[in-house]
Amino acid sequence: MKVAVSQLRVEENSQHLDDILETIAYAADQVDLVCFPEYFLGKLAPEPMPSPAVAAIQEVARLAKVNVVCGVTRDLRHGDGSYLTSMVIDRAGQIVARLDKTCLYPAEQLWYRAGQGQLWAELDGGIGIGVLAGFDLLRADLVRAAVREGAQLLIAQFAADSPEYLETVRSAISTRALEHLAPVVAVGQLGNFFGREYIGGSTVVRPTLSGAGVPGPVERILAMEDEEDMWVVELDLDAFREMRHRFSYYDPPRIPRAL
């Protein structure tokens, strides 16, 4: 699978839809999937989904025949509050999943409800992906649930405002890749948002096996800095599936001894 990592510069009070649409159109015939950062549309008020912006993304995805994992939208559901929701759009321009962010930042908890549903989706007739926005990546139980449902590729969206925090997030990314023997595509926030300057740092890692058939070191195949750019990585999901058949940290399951 060829995946485009789109690290857009997003400023809080600017409009970015045209940049998003141009990125998707440019990716046509080059990639299978385009991934955007968490706050990819800027600061917008909650509204019912799909919004006009999301509808425009759907149409361009259809014309480009490419899958898209959006950053969070502010999904207003009358009678049920607002959620931070990542839309997964297929090559036909259809929304195949609406994945609600579960682990909210303290400031987000004042305005949004935490999701309780699935954090995975299926693309191209059977390729499972897990989508983890913000702190969801740090919740081992959420990642494990997505993998158990069939996620073969983990997509994370994060916002780091210092080199130290970026290194912390990258450590978590590598841990998830090693734990589940699955590649992780992590798209970093770039630009001034919420009064902070986010430094990008988009990262892609993949697990490896040693000659003895046990997990080796995680390989970092992309490590962006603070540039606004789109990079394409190619991931052999069949090879990682075979790797998981040969070894698993969860098989056999641990059974506590009776006291």
Where are these regions (language model features)?
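Short beta-strand scaffold segments in enzyme catalytic cores
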Residues: C70-V72, L84-V88, L119-W120, G201-V204, ...
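CN hydrolase (nitrilase-like) catalytic-core segments centered on the catalytic cysteine
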Residues: P52-V69, L138-E227
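Active-site catalytic loop in hydrolytic enzyme cores
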Residues: H78-Q152, S162-T175, E242, S248-Y249
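Short hydrophobic-aromatic micro-motifs
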Residues: V34, I127-A133, I155-A156, V185
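Cys-nucleophile CN-hydrolase/nitrilase-fold catalytic domain and related Cys-dependent amidase chemistry
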Residues: E11-A92, R98, D161-A182
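Extreme N-terminal starter segment of soluble prokaryotic enzymes
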Residues: M1-V5
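Active-site mouth loops of central-metabolism enzymes
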Residues: R9-H16, I129-G134
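A short C-terminal boundary segment appended to hydrolase-like catalytic domains
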Residues: L235-L259
